[in-house]
Amino acid sequence: MGFPFSLPFDLQGWVDEHRHELRPPVANRQIWQDSDMIVMVVGGGNRRTDYHDDPRPEFFHQIEGSMVLRIMEDEGHPPVDLEIRAGEVFLLPPGIRHSPQRADPDGIGLVVEYARPEG
């Protein structure tokens, strides 16, 4: 009998199996494709210049290395850099403009967010 959901699995094993895909230029891999949640593993070695915001919270878990979440608090003011280190988690509230910076080439992070509606 099959389950209507996936079974638990070893996340570190999954990362090790897909590590070669977590390099620039794309540097990310979505774990589940048919879900209302976007659960992706993101590799390092890249810097973004764009900012975006989400209408719902976004969860960050840094598995290996470190990353900087650049947060734009107020227009016209410099951004605030929030470092997230290996083993740390952070829940970004909705509506905050941010730009994930993954300069650490050995960094690996898990990002969970709600799927965005089309349009």
Segment roles from a protein language model:
Residues 39, 50-52, 57-62, 81-82, ...:
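His/acidic/aromatic-lined binding-pocket segments of jelly-roll/cupin-type domains
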Residues 71, 87, 100-102:
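Cyclic nucleotide-binding regulatory domains
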Residues 42-44, 53-73, 109-115:
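Short, conserved beta-strand element in jelly-roll/cupin
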Residues 28, 46-48, 57, 79-80, ...:
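Short secondary-structure capping micro-motifs at structural edges
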Residues 94-118:
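Ligand-binding loop in jelly-roll beta-barrel domains
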Residues 1-43, 48-50:
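A short, N-terminal "cap"/entry segment at the start of jelly-roll beta-barrel domains
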Residues 73-94:
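Short acidic-glycine-tyrosine-enriched beta hairpin
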